[in-house]
Amino acid sequence: PEIEKLVVGLRDQGRIIYICTNGVFMRKKMRDYLASVYDEAWEPKLKLLHTESLIDEKDLVFIRSGKPSKSKVIAPSEWLYWNVHVDGLEYTHDLIVEREGVFKECVAAIRMAKIIGYQVATNTTVYKETDVSEIEDMFAYLSSLEVDGHTISPGYDYDAAKKDMVKRLGKQPEDFFMTRQMTREKFARIQEWGEKFTIFGTPVYQEFLSGKRELRCSAWAIPTRNIQGWKAPCYQMTDGHYNGYQEMLNKVDWDRYGVVNGFARDSRCENCMVHCGYDPSGALGVDAEFGDTWKNVRYNFGPKPQPYHEGAEVQAFNGCSINKGHLAGARQAVNEPLESVITGEQEPAASFSSKGTSDVVL
């Protein structure tokens, strides 16, 4: 409930902000902003938003009322990104988040944000069951929406995630999360993706993910702060909290963590390759190799990939939008004739590719 105040405070400190979101309340926050700044100059964009079904008549009335205070809204800024969680195209993403319609809302929120003038990034986690070709199609589709960049990271079986997986989904972590070797196989083409799409992550980190080099973790470089204080040693693992960042730096024995020369100093670190630990290593020159500095300079200041308009051809809405969501499949199973259950005769299941076609599998 205090996210707006937090964002305004961080902006006053001159910080770059990524608002990580599942997209569900994003359009509401942007309507609040529009109401806070409304004047007649906004009418062309309001008309476009309404024509594109991104706001409705009720929203127009609210926006034109001009009620919210400017100090309590999230305004566009060159220092701020909406960072929308998207783990695949419609069928896959809705399945992972266990709620149909979320992908559609994410896309609507992204489109609305770009019309208003926000910067938008996406955040994707790759799991053992992730179809890499679908991730490429997802990037292509999102690029056609002129998303500004993408963060992508391997799923890692840290303690909180493992407990949630068992409790919420009834799945064993080893069936969902990846080993280091699996991560390298999934990310083998990440540098090719970076040529076509704007991938947020240093070239050195991308080489690490694809198995072309090793890096040591710099967990202290992207720290986590929550209501209990500075969390150590990292976002995934909690061995303690500290009142100040310097106190955390001084008191944590950083040599106890990470993987060095193939040896996991802490067993919890064994399969971790996530960006919050290793991406800063690429930026700071940890385990530096000849040419790394030039790679980073080119990445930060060189030309960026242009929007991939061909991505609009991807059939992104391949789930509940065409009545083939996971809940539709469950309803079909429940409503099957009793005879089919007794005889074992069933309609063949369908698997859906990222292009929206259906392949029959027996």
Predicted regions and their residues:
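Short, solvent-exposed turn/loop segments enriched in Gly/Ser/Thr/Pro and often Arg
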Residues: 1, 22, 153-156, 277-278
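Residues at alpha-helix caps and immediate loop-helix transition turns in enzyme cores, especially N-
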Residues: 2-3, 29-30, 134-138
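N-terminal active-site wall of soluble small-molecule enzyme domains
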Residues: 2-10
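Radical SAM enzyme [4Fe-4S]-AdoMet core and its adjacent flexible, acidic
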Residues: 9, 13-16, 43-46, 50-52, ...
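Internal, charge-rich low-complexity segments
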Residues: 22-56
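Ligand-binding grooves and catalytic loops that recognize ribose/phosphate and carbohydrate rings
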Residues: 35, 39, 63-64, 72-74, ...
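Flexible mid-to-C-terminal extensions adjoining Fe-S/redox cofactors in radical SAM and related proteins
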Residues: 231-362
